[in-house]
């Protein structure tokens, strides 16, 4: 699970957080996590309280993607990541999630991450409003996934 806000102990060293994940999660690959952290230039001797929101997000993404989970829940995975780093983060997610797993992403930044989507679930007031293949939605409304969703919402509002 990748929350949209940090749940990490602020004063704990990154190296200790990695060790904690190694203890708690049998599917956690500490070496892989250290490699992912290195791609973001996150030192093991840092603490979350010394990091920006974007760096904490990258730390949490590294921790989550170093697992071989069957289900990944990502809540706004690039919400705090600067624009320049977003493509790198998305590539990292695509390259490192368990191919036998399922990824559920909650986001408002559809344009930035639509290449990750196979299917789209639209919730309205806590209920599933739409559940369809991304390609089907694009074909029905044309354009990008974001444009298709906007067209769908306009159509529903006109009813």
What are these regions (language model features)?
Residues 3-59:
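ABC-family P-loop ATPase nucleotide-binding domains
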Residues 72-76, 81:
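Catalytic Walker B motif of ABC-type/P-loop ATPase nucleotide-binding domains
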Residues 86-99:
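Helical segment within the ABC ATPase nucleotide-binding domain
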Residues 101-109:
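Conserved H-loop
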Residues 113-115:
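A short, surface-exposed alpha-helical micro-motif characterized by mixed small hydrophobic
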Residues 131-132:
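ABC ATPase "signature
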């Amino acid at each position: 699970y990748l929350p949209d806000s940090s749940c990490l102990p602020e004063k704990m060293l990154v190296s200790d957080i990695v060790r904690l994940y190694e203890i708690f999660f049998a599917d956690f690959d500490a070496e892989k996590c250290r490699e992912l952290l290195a791609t973001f230039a996150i030192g093991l001797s840092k603490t979350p309280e010394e990091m920006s929101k974007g760096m904490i997000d990258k730390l949490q993404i590294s921790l989550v993607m170093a697992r071989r989970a069957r289900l990944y829940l990502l809540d706004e995975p690039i919400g705090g990541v600067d624009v320049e780093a977003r493509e790198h983060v998305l590539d990292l997610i695509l390259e490192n999630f368990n191919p036998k797993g399922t990824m559920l992403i909650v986001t408002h930044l559809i344009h930035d991450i639509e290449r990750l989507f196979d299917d789209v679930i639209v919730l309205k007031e806590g209920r599933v409003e739409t559940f369809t293949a991304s390609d089907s939605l694009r074909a029905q409304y044309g354009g990008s996934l974001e444009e298709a969703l906007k067209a769908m919402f306009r159509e529903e509002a006109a009813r």
